[in-house]
Amino acid sequence: MAAVPELSSEVTAYHSDENELFFEVDGPNKMQYCFQDRDLCSLDEGIKLQISHQHFNKSFRQTVSLIVAVEKLRKKLAPCTWAFQDDDLRPLLPFIFEEEPIVCDTWDEEYESDTPVPSRNCTLHDIQHKRLVLSDPCELKALHLNGDNLNRQVVFSMSFVQGERSDNKMPVALGLKGKNLYLSCVMKDGKPVLQLESVDGKQYPKKKMEKRFVFNKITSKSTVEFESAQFPNWYISTSQAEHKPVFLGNNNGQDIIDFKLELVSS
């Protein structure tokens, strides 16, 4: 057992040489208090000490006196008048922590959320009412349709992806519903071109699409334009002529860049 240090002057004020306890010589299993010539002292509320005038080891006597003194001191402490809450620490936080902006320059695809990318199914036709149809495995053309031919028009799955946003501009990706094909913009022979690109259906669409797949959907009154995010000022366009391929134009000449968008049920 560790030795009990000598009591300080502050503690000895609560110490009395009369505060002695007695143990039987048979050992601790038969420990009891001896009340020969005993006095009953009430030191404080909840603390009562029975004193015996028997000879006993001084160190143990000091230990008992120390316990009594600590109890008396504890009762002299003023009780807390309010419950300690998280708000009590708030004024200290600025001295402990320093706010720094979180800047994320890169994105790790492995840590992206597996939440489905928001999307809408829609059809497009230009302001001359030409519809977009899939004429070859990887080519869109614009032509007038009517009656039963309307079911030839392609249905787009328009996904809302990461990119620059404003009041009238929304970054989207345009995939063909039911097919692993997406419109993309690439450079060929020194000129931006529009193409249908085949993708892995298990990986696409995703929230952060490669920039060649992203179009800025710009709303103007009742029409929309689709500007390439990869090549600013280049738009999905149709020709004035019938049955011509959909292409990427820079709004020069007679190219049509204004479309009507119609939402369709899933």
Swiss-Prot record:
One function term, GO molecular function aspect: interleukin-1 receptor binding
UniProt-annotated site: Important for interaction with integrin, residues: 169, 177, 179, 188, 202
Gene Ontology biological process terms, A to Z: astrocyte activation; cellular response to interleukin-17; cellular response to lipopolysaccharide; cellular response to mechanical stimulus; cellular response to xenobiotic stimulus; defense response to Gram-positive bacterium; ectopic germ cell programmed cell death; extrinsic apoptotic signaling pathway in absence of ligand
Keyword Oxidoreductase: no
Matching Gene3D superfamilies: 2.80.10.50
Pfam families named among the record's database cross-references: IL1 (PF00340), IL1_propep (PF02394)
SUPFAM superfamilies hit by this protein: Cytokine (SSF50353)
Subcellular localization: Cytoplasm, Cytosol; Secreted; Lysosome; Secreted, Extracellular exosome
Keyword Secreted: yes
Keywords (A to Z) from UniProt: Cytokine, Cytoplasm, Inflammatory response, Lysosome, Mitogen, Pyrogen, Secreted
Propeptide positions: 1-114
Protein family according to the UniProt entry: Belongs to the IL-1 family.
Note: IL1B production occurs in 2 steps, each being controlled by different stimuli. First, inflammatory signals, such as LPS, stimulate the synthesis and promote the accumulation of cytosolic stores of pro-IL1B (priming). Then additional signals are required for inflammasome assembly, leading to CASP1 activation, pro-IL1B processing and eventually secretion of the active cytokine. IL1B processing and secretion are temporarily associated.
Cited PANTHER family: INTERLEUKIN-1 BETA (PTHR10078:SF30), INTERLEUKIN-1 FAMILY MEMBER (PTHR10078)
Role this protein plays: Potent pro-inflammatory cytokine. Initially discovered as the major endogenous pyrogen, induces prostaglandin synthesis, neutrophil influx and activation, T-cell activation and cytokine production, B-cell activation and antibody production, and fibroblast proliferation and collagen production. Promotes Th17 differentiation of T-cells. Synergizes with IL12/interleukin-12 to induce IFNG synthesis from T-helper 1 (Th1) cells. Plays a role in angiogenesis by inducing VEGF production synergistically with TNF and IL6.
Quaternary organization: Monomer. In its precursor form, weakly interacts with full-length MEFV; the mature cytokine does not interact at all. Interacts with integrins ITGAV:ITGBV and ITGA5:ITGB1; integrin-binding is required for IL1B signaling. Interacts with cargo receptor TMED10; the interaction is direct and is required for the secretion of IL1B mature form. Interacts with HSP90AB1; the interaction facilitates cargo translocation into the ERGIC. Interacts with HSP90B1; the interaction facilitates cargo translocation into the ERGIC.
Entry protein name: Interleukin-1 beta
The species this protein was found in: Cavia porcellus
